[in-house]
Amino acid sequence: MELSLVVFTVVCWVSVWSDDRIISDRHAVYWNSSNSRFWQGEYTVAVSINDYLDVYCPYYESPQPHSRMERYILFMVNHDGYLTCEHRMRGFKRWECNRPQSPDGPLRFSEKFQLFTPFSLGFEFRPGHEYYYISSPHPNHAGKPCLKLKVYVKPTSSGYESPEPFLTDQSQRCGADGPCLAVLMLLLVFLLAGV
């Protein structure tokens, strides 16, 4: 009986362990002109499916003149819009950094890189593709530099990418060659042997 309990515990642990690979990463981007990663014009972040991009807007704790506080409108654009820093080229407004002295701290916007979204305002991303974000200074702050970001969604290990990952994503299940199958087989042997 005790051995069966140990085997059951191990199987449960392996099941949880295999799901650890699903945990997503968070990538922080501080969207302001003092961020040196924007200075070269090639700020790129590589993400995986189910990762998050957290964009932090400019924030000022101490009082500043209104004209010195940065405010931006962020757009998702196509490649041409990224190269020219022009949001009118098949781009759409994604977020607005318009509260640089928010009492709750800096505004943060999050993008989840997923194959399918249930939300009407969500966006679906594909592995192996690049996505582009640019900012246009707030209308009251024309002449500020254009900040732009390229996000590369890394390819997954499976060859086929379905819009419904729960149907085809092998990394989320026990495979025939994984440790999960070996533990389940061991459990079956113990149960059949009557241990």
Swiss-Prot record:
Propeptide: 175-195
One GO term of the biological process aspect: osteoclast differentiation
Binding partners and assembly: Binds to the receptor tyrosine kinases epha2, epha3, epha4 and epha5. Interacts with epha8; activates epha8.
Tissue-level expression: Widespread expression in the embryo.
Gene Ontology CC terms, in alphabetical order: plasma membrane; side of membrane
Residues of the signal peptide: 1-16
Keyword 4Fe-4S: no
Cystine pairings recorded for this chain: 57-97, 85-146
Function: Cell surface GPI-bound ligand for Eph receptors, a family of receptor tyrosine kinases which are crucial for migration, repulsion and adhesion during neuronal, vascular and epithelial development. Binds promiscuously Eph receptors residing on adjacent cells, leading to contact-dependent bidirectional signaling into neighboring cells. The signaling pathway downstream of the receptor is referred to as forward signaling while the signaling pathway downstream of the ephrin ligand is referred to as reverse signaling.
Membrane topology: Lipid-anchor; GPI-anchor
Record family assignment: Belongs to the ephrin family.
Ranges where the Ephrin RBD domain occurs: 24-157
Subcellular location per the Swiss-Prot or TrEMBL entry: Cell membrane
Glycosylation (residues): 32
One Pfam family matching this protein: Ephrin
Protein name: Ephrin-A2
Lipid-conjugated positions (GPI-anchor amidated cysteine): 174
